Amino acid sequence: MEPFNLKSFKKKMMLNRSTLRRFLTRVETKEPKGIDKVQHQEDVEVWKDMDCLACANCCKTMSPTFTNDDIKRISKHVGMSAQAFRDKYLYFERGDKDWMNKQQPCQFLNLVDNKCSIYEVRPRDCSGFPHHTKKKVLDYTHVYKQNVEYCPATYKLVERMMYRLEGEKLK
């Protein structure tokens, strides 16, 4: 596995973002036959070369949504009341009606080793990220469109699916 370089990922993503998004839009418009099987196969391959601790871009640039159960579990773990936890770390996003981090990078991310200080009790949104196999591809293209910009594993997955299904290679 070669060392991960976040700066080169961001350059590559900027260069290929529109191509990947167009592919995902085509998938939404006309679902390719066998895409879910291809997705599962390529997901296995992608994770052979990915190390989340080498990146942690999701924790540095995105906020998970916190459910009420997440808030109760995490606040208990850090020795705070749920209300004190919300007041200190979260804000309520009125549009989506979600609890989100007030700051990025995440307050629980150790920026030296990219490890989460609450890993055992982290939000459900974090434990499932990047949500590759959560639902069928067609039901989750909107999530791929968002995550492809932040997550190298999602970028690589969409790139590999595009090549397998359409034979198109990125720059």
PLM regions and their residue ranges:
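Short loop/turn segments that flank or connect secondary-structure elements
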Residues: 1-171
